[in-house]
């Protein structure tokens, strides 16, 4: 798995974090003041990149969390199968299958020979944009 580490206090809206083993995009960060006993706490609300599920993380601001490394690639659609798409990476010429996106905006643009941008996060791939 390709991950790095950072503290909860350094997370910003729009950054990525691993919660419950799934990479998530941070949509809200709130920090509570330090109390008489203990350290400041942060409440992080994030949405899963692959599942779209809302996840929360409540932790001290100095706690270490995993941050996924996102590798961005360009590929070309070779074949459109029922629920998957066969894609060839335009840098390495590797051929693989990737799940068809559920968003209507992306699904309507999928056709053979179209170029697309996909992200590889923690060994999984997701189509982000179809050109």
UniProtKB/Swiss-Prot annotation:
Any one Gene Ontology biological process term?
positive regulation of translational elongation
List the gene name. Answer: eIF5A
List the molecular function annotations (GO) for this entry: ribosome binding; RNA binding; translation elongation factor activity; translation initiation factor activity
Protein name, per record:
Translation initiation factor 5A
The record lists the organism as Saccharolobus islandicus (strain L.S.2.15 / Lassen #1) (Sulfolobus islandicus)
Q: Where in the cell is it found?
A: Cytoplasm
Q: Which residues are annotated as modified residue Hypusine in the UniProt record?
A: 36
Recorded family membership: Belongs to the eIF-5A family.
Q: Which UniProt keywords apply?
A: Cytoplasm, Hypusine, Initiation factor, Protein biosynthesis
